[in-house]
Amino acid sequence: MLPLRAVSQVAGMNNLSVLDMTASARAAGLGMDYLPIADGDLSIAVDNPSMFMPSMHNAITFSYVGMFSHVGMGQVSYARDFGRPGVFAATMKYHNYGLFDGYDEYDNSTGRFYACDVTAILSWGFKIDSSFSFGVSAKPTFSQYASYTALAIAFDMSASYVHPNRRFVATVIGRNVGAQFFFGQAKTDWTPFEISAALSYKLSKAPFRFFLAITELQQWNLMYEDMYNPSQTTDPFTGEVTKRSGVAKFFDNAGRHVLAGVELNIGKVVFLRFGYNFRQMREMQASSGFNTSGFSYGLGLRIKGFEFSYARNNYHLLQAPNYFTLSTNLERFMKKR
């Protein structure tokens, strides 16, 4: 149901991938889910709660992701600063997987059914001092696939350091601490827990900000093991038998932990973004040859208090999700009254 995600846990070996999927076009353009950047972007703070700041008071953001075929995701977020207690935010995220034709084990039609996930995110961010901040998000998620329903409750926690000049930002984040409960079944699954770290650095005399993330610190081996080809020495498309050295496997595995991106700021109005995810490329490639899976790019425009972002993240050779985000601050409208 969810083959789109290739970042949390070993591919094909976890449930609730929906908890990891960002709706932020800015984050998607840079190839990351949690950006370490302190510039008041609410869409970023939803995924990295330690990035909430007082300047987000009355900020609101809308996002839509057009995925494959009829699959889509929408998100709306609102934040409010309460002074010393910190910044609180509420987010609603909806994943629609479309309408399906149902059949039983005898190939008899059982009618049509919908599949969807709905997540309500409640977030809190607090500045410890001028440089350090902390945040936490609660993410209850209701899932319904035909007659199957489940409820997951997961938490994200992050801590960030922001240099006084704001050119250097670092974040450590723990995501998806929780469990999923299935209605009508005596079954409980753990949500896909992840510990990651990320940093960004803006050059002092050039309009570039670089991003780097080290993901899945709780698990070294991120290579997918095919039960029908456990040694992974046979290409499933060409049938070619290959053998890799231990050194090659080490660097392959190490590369799967690394995400990289760069943002170009043109006159504080236009933003160009590029990202690369080696693991996504390795898991989604159709053959041993080069392909664009794992590459992402995006565009941002900031005009008269509104910020629009678009991104495209290449998960597959033929299709890729398109991300759209519109952000503003309601304060600018209130002041005009």
What does each of the following model-derived ranges do?
Residues 7-337:
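Subset of outer-membrane beta-barrel
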